[in-house]
Amino acid sequence: TFLHFSEGLVHIVYIDYLKLAASYENNCAVDEITDDKLESMFDKLEEQYGGYCFDEDYEKKVFSTWSVNDFFQSVVSNKFVYFGEYWYDNGGVPKILSDFVKNNEQELFDCILKGKFISVPTSDLKFPPSLISINPKVLMCQTGYLTLCSNLKYFEMLLGIPNGEIYKALNRL
């Protein structure tokens, strides 16, 4: 199961860690962190580890729990800000991912380098068959390498790369 944090939850649960990261990023004390500096750090966090959408209406985006936790753990232990590829580094390159990249190279290339989206029938997302016959694009969405980029009201869904962490990971393949 893919767990996630909402924007509000990150602001509430991780506020002290956000302030600490912002203080390292700005070379100042935690009590000198302004709202602007705090929001700037949050925006960077969101760009790297947020952007996942599993909402039929394409309204709510969430963060990768694994990556957010590892990011803040790194900030505390290393005393500097480093936006690593925590989720990807934990899982390695599963065969299913390397097969997907090999079989969808041009479409994925267009998504990575040209900012285009990957199209998939809505019915494939709403009613995925067994793991053996699932549309590989849907599986990549379910495993977090792609995310919803449009609502489910049409016959085709658009999928895209959720964030900087996954963008960098896909570029490494």
Residue ranges and their predicted role:
Residues 1-173:
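Phosphate-binding site recognition
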